[in-house]
Amino acid sequence: GVSTTTIHRALTGKPGISDQLRTTIQNLAVEMNYQPNLAASALKRNELHIAVLLPEPFLDNRYYYASLWAGIHKFMENAGNFNAVLDEYYYPLLPGAHGEALKSIYQSHLDKIDGFITIGIKENQSSYFIDQFNRAHIPCVILGTDLYGASKLCCVKSHDIMAGNMAAELFTTFLPDQTDRTILLTGNPLGQSAMIDQFYNLNAFQDYLSKTRSPVKLQTAYCTDINQLEEMISPFLSSREVLPYGIYASSARHTVKICEILEKHHLEKQIKIVGNDHFPESIEYLRKGTLTAIIDKKISQQSYTAAKILLEYLSLGRYPERSVMEVQPDILIRSSLSASDN
């Protein structure tokens, strides 16, 4: 026989037993349909504090970040057995603000938190303080964009290359081989405040056209200030002769802005628009036909998964399957919408 301590170590991934014995115990647990009593385990430890640092989901931020917050909240609503609470922190979408917020939390709240969830911002101070949290034995799960080299527990993100490929295929699959059409790409390839997910998305779109030798012509209207977008694309809307065949918006806020602009000019039925992300405004534009399709990167599923991974690691010692967990996107078209979609 084996002791209860040995069984606990085998089922929670803790060291102190051989790999062979661990595998034997885990296989038996699966055969017996064993489920750990999280409520009983929670009574033996103090309350876990999970810090979440994301932009506030207001104004234009709500299109993307409201979904991130929603996924975390949904998991926590059903995670009572973990004996955990959220400590929510916000920061403005400005250069350097993410690193400053991490610094403030590290200096003032380090002894009050057990785990951390935030987005991947490619700035030196952000990476530095994520490393500092790791050295203080506070695991961090990163959302949206991986920070290569940063000491995180794991990253949960969309499969951005797949998203770009899917959008390009949507535009070109039904075009005759010799069709000479123009597609306008909009977004911010440097990412919003140094997130680089759009960079991979847009690059994949262009790579797909190159690999398939598509005759489609590409034009770009990239901008960091969304208020500049209408002025940038106005030359493409000036006459029927120069109208693009389609527009691909690589971000949530560009998706909304493009729809607003084309409706303002009464061109929404003349140009195919593929946008990104599932949120109430994008679903409404899809439902009324302004959007042709949406690349749904399942933002709330990403953050739900991140919260689940972090709590299972802290409570059960269960490590993530991979250092980078990529959530595969879906394509939404009007006929695929359910009555529950807002």
Which ranges hold each PLM region?
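Hydrophobic alpha-helical
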Residues: 105, 115-135, 205, 216-283
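N-terminal helix-turn-helix DNA-binding module of bacterial transcription factors
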Residues: 1-46
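Hinge/cleft segment of the Venus flytrap/periplasmic-binding protein
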Residues: 32, 193, 209-212, 298-342
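Amphipathic helical "hinge" segments at domain boundaries
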Residues: 35-101
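Short beta-strand elements in bilobed, periplasmic/extracellular small-molecule ligand-binding domains
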Residues: 76-98, 181-184, 202-227, 243
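Short, solvent-exposed amphipathic alpha-helices that sit
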Residues: 63-80, 163-167, 193-216, 257-261, ...
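Hydrophobic alpha-helical segments within soluble ligand-binding/sensing domains
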Residues: 155-182, 229-233, 282, 298-315
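Flexible loop/hinge segments that line or gate small-molecule binding clefts
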Residues: 121-162, 279-287, 291
